[in-house]
Amino acid sequence: MIHLIAQALWLGGIVFFLVVLGPAVQELEPKLAIKTLDRGRTGLETVSWIAIGLLLASGIFNLVVRAQAGTMPGEAWGILLGAKLLLFSAMVVHHSLQVFKYGPVMSRLVAQLPRSVPAWPESLLSQWRRWFLLLKINAALGPIAVLLGLALTKN
């Protein structure tokens, strides 16, 4: 159950950011939009790391319990698990790039903003575009990982 809640937490945060927060800030004046998006980004990072930790812990626990019970299915199950772990790993790498590569640059650029910002600075906009691309990739990979997880429960 914890595994499912953690998946919903991470994917829900991604979907909220893409469907609600991202489009909503476009209606705001640039400085407020930038600060709102940056605050949302740091919140999503926190929620995502909590979910990733829960997914790792509960996934390992589930695997150990299954192994100790001697109910490890065959080769097809192993292939499904490998595919799911590959997708999960890719999502964690993407999230790490967002947090450790783009996040600090965006935070620094936001902190350097003048009092009045008539438009998005190109340097900041460029960073956000890269950040959002990784978020969209994770939004595509996440449901596939969930479907693989469901397939694992059927075997």
What label would you give each PLM region?
Residues 1-155:
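Polytopic transmembrane helical bundles with strong interfacial aromatic enrichment
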